[in-house]
């Protein structure tokens, strides 16, 4: 019989993850040294990559930082990579770490302005097809200049606030302190139909906005973290990155927006729900009340945020400094001129990005293993052995399939560094490298909307507080994303294969 202490260790290991998941991770850790001894470092390294992808695919069971971190720690101890190689990877990708540390935090301080923008949109437009199109387009536009995670967080904040307002009224708990929006027990039958329609309405808007972040995120250097990785390797600044990717990103953006309208008109794949008139009236009264409460200080803060957004866009377009440093500039400007000087208030802005920043360091440790064991060299050589006109399309497919089940930052890092090594070795022209870089960028960004695992914004939406409130499950997200996946993936592949 096991002792209480050993039971406590077992319960503490990976927290609330399922028992089968804990045992699987332990099995990986026990298998790797044995495999290294029996099969050698290359086979062992391939298995490690597969194990790490498994932890990414199971991100809803346990955040990948802990199991993935244990795996790469073991890899370093086994000599599959060296700490020096990991440090070299981190130095090489320091601009990406700066982006995650400061740009995401900088946009956090613009949330009030963005919340106001989306709230006005939700109540000001009565046509559901037009509203969905505007949500998708606005999310795309904001993600092109800001950060997809933060844009998604803003849309979630709007949805949570409005859902809670109506749910509280529908359940008759306007003044109740122990109000719980997650339960419908106190919602009378009279309001249940409106509540379910409102849930479907919010689900569709959330999905349109999430897809919009992918449509806009692929277009620019700062739209997604992997874009900065690719742009850094290719030596592209903001305007040059946009120009290189535009032959693929612009047609896909147009097709994605058209898909948005068609889905609302056809009412297929869970789209098309309308905002009930009774719900609109409650939300409009709430918005008017909030507007009346907004004093001179709050209005001044909104003006500062708008000016900081303008500084951000101009700074990015002119590339006055590294992207992360521009994010730090935004933090300083907004906090200084809105009176946010408390250390704990400022610290909240960094909570969202730092766990992912730590996970990115683990990514780079796996990349160091791949480099030191030359794992992807045969694959890249096989692609480069194809006729030049077939290479971009094949890279798009290879990136897309892996990005749909894994993390697109991880996938992009592997492929762009391998292709850059081939360029440095003289195996391709600079022009062809640029074409392959676009294929890698679009391949990791577009088909990855297929599952919540592929896009950080999708995973963030699925694990957020709004998902259970509007009944947005993993399977429902995959189903609602399917038409977008087919259109964006199919047209993206065609554009990469024929228009570059």
Curated annotation (Swiss-Prot):
Q: Which reaction does it catalyse?
A: 2 Na(+)(in) + 3 H(+)(out) = 2 Na(+)(out) + 3 H(+)(in)
Per the record, the similarity remark reads:
Belongs to the NhaB Na(+)/H(+) (TC 2.A.34) antiporter family.
Sorted alphabetically, the keyword list is: Antiport, Cell inner membrane, Cell membrane, Ion transport, Membrane, Sodium, Sodium transport, Transmembrane, Transmembrane helix, Transport
Q: What is its membrane topology?
A: Multi-pass membrane protein
| Listed Pfam families | NhaB
All disulfide bonds of the chain are none
Q: Where are the transmembrane segments?
A: 28-50, 68-88, 98-118, 121-141, 145-165, 205-225, 244-264, 311-331, 350-370, 394-414, 449-469, 477-497
Localization of this protein? Cell inner membrane
Task: Please name the GO terms that the record assigns under molecular function.
Answer: sodium:proton antiporter activity
Query: What InterPro entries does the record tag this protein with?
Result: Na+/H+_antiporter_NhaB
Primary localisation category: membrane
Q: What does this protein do?
A: Na(+)/H(+) antiporter that extrudes sodium in exchange for external protons.
Source domain of life: Bacteria
Record protein name field: Na(+)/H(+) antiporter NhaB
Q: Name one GO cellular component term.
A: plasma membrane
């Amino acid at each position: 019989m096991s002792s209480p202490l050993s039971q406590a260790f077992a319960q503490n290991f990976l927290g609330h993850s399922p028992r089968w998941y804990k045992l699987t991770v332990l099995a990986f850790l026990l298998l790797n040294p044995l495999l290294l001894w029996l099969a050698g470092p290359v086979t062992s390294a391939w298995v490690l990559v597969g194990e790490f992808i498994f932890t990414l695919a199971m991100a809803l069971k346990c955040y990948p930082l802990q199991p993935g971190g244990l795996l790469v720690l073991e890899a370093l101890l086994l000599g599959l990579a060296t700490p020096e190689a990991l440090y070299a990877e981190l130095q090489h990708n320091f601009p990406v770490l700066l982006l995650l540390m400061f740009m995401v935090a900088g946009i956090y301080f613009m949330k009030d302005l963005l919340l106001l923008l989306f709230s006005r949109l939700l109540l000001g437009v009565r046509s559901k097809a037009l509203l969905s199109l505007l949500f998708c387009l606005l999310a795309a536009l904001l993600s092109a200049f800001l950060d997809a995670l933060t844009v998604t967080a803003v849309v979630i904040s709007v949805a949570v606030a409005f859902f809670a307002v109506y749910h509280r009224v529908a359940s008759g708990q306007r003044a109740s302190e122990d109000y719980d929006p997650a339960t419908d027990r106190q919602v009378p039958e009279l309001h249940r139909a409106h509540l379910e329609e409102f849930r479907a309405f919010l689900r569709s808007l959330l999905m349109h906005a999430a897809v919009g972040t992918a449509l806009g995120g692929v277009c620019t250097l700062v739209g997604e973290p992997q874009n900065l990785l690719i742009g850094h390797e290719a030596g592209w600044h903001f305007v040059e990155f946009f120009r290189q990717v535009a032959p693929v990103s612009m047609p896909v953006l147009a097709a994605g927006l058209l898909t948005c309208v068609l889905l609302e008109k056809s009412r297929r794949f869970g789209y098309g729900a309308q905002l009930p008139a009774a719900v609109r009236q409650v939300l409009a009264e709430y918005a008017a009340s909030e507007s009346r409460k907004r004093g001179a200080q709050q209005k001044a803060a909104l003006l500062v945020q708008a000016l900081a957004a303008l500084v951000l866009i101009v700074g990015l377009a002119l590339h006055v400094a590294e992207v992360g440093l521009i994010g730090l500039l935004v933090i300083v400007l907004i906090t200084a001129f809105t009176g946010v000087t408390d250390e704990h208030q400022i610290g909240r802005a960094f909570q969202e990005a730092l766990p992912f920043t730590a996970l990115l360091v683990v990514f780079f440790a796996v990349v160091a293993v791949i480099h030191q064991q030359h794992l992807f060299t045969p694959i890249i050589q096989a692609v480069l052995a194809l006729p030049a006109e077939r290479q971009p399309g094949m890279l798009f497919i290879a990136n897309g399939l892996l990005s749909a089940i894994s993390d697109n930052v991880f996938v992009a890092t592997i492929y762009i560094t391998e292709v850059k090594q081939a360029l440095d070795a003289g195996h391709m022209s600079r022009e062809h490298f640029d074409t392959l870089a676009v294929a890698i960028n679009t391949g990791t960004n577009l088909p990855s909307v297929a599952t919540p695992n592929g896009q950080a914004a999708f995973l963030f939406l699925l694990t957020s507080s709004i998902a259970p409130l509007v009944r947005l499950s993993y399977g429902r997200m995959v189903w609602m994303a399917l038409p977008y996946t087919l259109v964006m993936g199919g047209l993206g592949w065609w554009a990469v294969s024929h228009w570059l």
